[in-house]
Amino acid sequence: SEDNKMGMAVFGQVRQKDGFDSDGDGFTELTALKAQTLGMRSYLKTGVYSKLTAEYHHLHEFRRGGDNLNLPPHEAMIAEQVEHGINTGSLRFDWFSPDDSHRLAAFASAQHISRSSYYGAGMDPDAYGATANLTWMAGTQYIRKFDRCIFMPSDLTLGLEYNEDRLNDNMWGYGRVTSQLVRIGSFYAQNEWKNHRWSFLLGGRLDKHNLVKGVIFSPRANLRFNPVDNVNLRASY
């Protein structure tokens, strides 16, 4: 818009190439390819100190290699074929206070992958497979900037996240079926004291994985020292 309160960018691409057989033996060295890509990113300023951002990406890709590319894969002597459909979207809200001492973000994203494949030789009718995968996450983050906390300016960061991953993978002809659901809930906190010469960071993260007993704690510590402007010494744990 003319007042820059909202905007959108859209892109797309189509790509296609034939399979390449360099020595004329009837088998490709480079696969045939068909691909379409579409995406967008938009934003809306909901206030002087807040903004909403949305993104979406779509990819469809088909690849085929081997011989007799015009026939179904199981009618070729050697065939490698894979087709992907990938859709990804995200939504994010950002807010900060007039003096920038408080920042808050809330976000969510998801991705769905659909994959069908064939990897076989000798006209094998059992070499087909299919995969479906849905992953999504949501969370929030808060940052508080202090002009002085105990002995130095600092930034306090707190956050919550939740991730879920559902996977179904099938190769029916070989009797292989995989189904898995993973859920992870997380909380993290850290405080970083810093000035132009020193920085001290202490923090930790708690993760609860549905396939792991108990809560996983991951500590974090970082020390930075700049004896002169062009020298940076750092130790991390």
Located regions from the model:
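Transmembrane beta-strands of outer-membrane beta-barrel pores
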Residues: 14-18, 58-62, 97, 110-114, ...
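Flexible loop and strand-edge segments within Gram-negative outer membrane beta-barrel domains
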Residues: 17-37, 43-45, 49-104, 110-133
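Repeated loop/turn-to-beta-strand initiation elements of outer-membrane beta-barrel proteins
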Residues: 5-8, 18, 48-52, 98-104, ...
